[in-house]
UniProtKB/Swiss-Prot annotation:
It comes from the Eukaryota. It comes from Morus indica. This is Potassium/proton antiporter CemA. It is a multi-pass membrane protein. GO terms for molecular function: antiporter activity; proton transmembrane transporter activity. GO terms for cellular component: chloroplast inner membrane. Keywords: Antiport, Chloroplast, Hydrogen ion transport, Ion transport, Membrane, Plastid, Plastid inner membrane, Potassium, Potassium transport, Transmembrane, Transmembrane helix, Transport. InterPro entries: CemA. It is found in: Plastid, Chloroplast inner membrane. The chain crosses the membrane at residues 7-27, 116-136, 156-176, 191-211. Contributes to K(+)/H(+) antiport activity by supporting proton efflux to control proton extrusion and homeostasis in chloroplasts in a light-dependent manner to modulate photosynthesis. Prevents excessive induction of non-photochemical quenching (NPQ) under continuous-light conditions. Indirectly promotes efficient inorganic carbon uptake into chloroplasts. It catalyses: K(+)(in) + H(+)(out) = K(+)(out) + H(+)(in). One of its GO terms (biological process) is potassium ion transport. Belongs to the CemA family.
């Protein structure tokens, strides 16, 4: 009975790990959501919601087009046929840029919708499988309890160095950048640098409070070993 329960719990754990990937892959091959987003974006009332980076990009592009038009007016010695070709080129470039902007916005909405749907399905799945989650939690607690204090201290030290250590900002930048990309958002250095400079500090404060309140009470020897290894 225990083996069967453990096997079911392992299947549940594998489902939690691979379910978001499977949902994302399903929407990639099934074009229904993409068609709905395309239809909604192209038929909705025209409303532009832009962040500062997008506004700067759009402004820069239109300034370039305006400069090109002014340059066009300065070329009075050109023949009318050549000037007409230049106007057509500016028009085609504008249309192409608008299409690229629309595709980018559709891509953002599609990725964001896919991730929200994955989160909702995963949450419902976790609630319905509460018994397996409790069993996995008990197995994890038993596994951690059986570890020696030295192994526990080493694991805590390794985890803290990875999350809030000297080289951790590079890892946070990569992780936040990949989350941004996964949700379809444009790369934003200001937000990423803001999160990287504040979030590890918050984690460090929470971790120190956890050592002070919990580990000192449960396992003082573990705290002594941890501080010895850390020094």
């Amino acid at each position: 009975m225990a083996k069967k329960k453990a096997f079911i719990s392992l299947l549940y754990l594998a489902s939690i790990v691979f379910l978001p990937w499977w949902i994302s892959l399903s929407f990639t091959f099934n074009k229904s959501l993409e068609s709905w987003v395309n239809n909604w974006w192209n038929t909705r009332p025209s409303e532009i919601l832009l962040n500062d980076i997008q506004e700067k990009s759009i402004l820069k592009k239109f300034i370039e087009l305006e400069e090109l038009s002014l340059f066009d007016e300065m070329l009075k010695e050109y023949s009318e046929r050549r000037l007409q070709k230049l106007h057509v080129g500016v028009y085609n470039e504008t249309i192409q840029w608008i299409k690229m902007h629309n595709e980018g916005r559709i891509h953002t909405i599609l990725h964001f919708s896919t991730n929200i749907i994955s989160f909702v399905i995963l949450s419902v799945f976790s609630i319905l499988s509460n018994e397996e989650l409790i069993f996995l939690n008990s197995c994890l607690q038993e596994f951690l309890y059986n570890l020696s204090d030295t192994i526990k201290a080493f694991s805590i030290l390794l985890l803290t160095d990875l999350c809030i250590g000297f080289h951790s900002p590079h890892g946070w930048e990569l992780m936040i950048g990949s989350i941004y990309k996964d949700f379809g958002f444009a790369h934003n250095d200001q937000i990423i640098s803001g999160v990287v400079s504040t979030f590890p500090v918050i984690l460090d404060t929470i971790f120190k409070y956890w050592i002070f309140r919990y580990l000192n009470r449960v396992s003082p020897s573990l705290v002594v070993i941890y501080h010895s290894m850390n020094d």
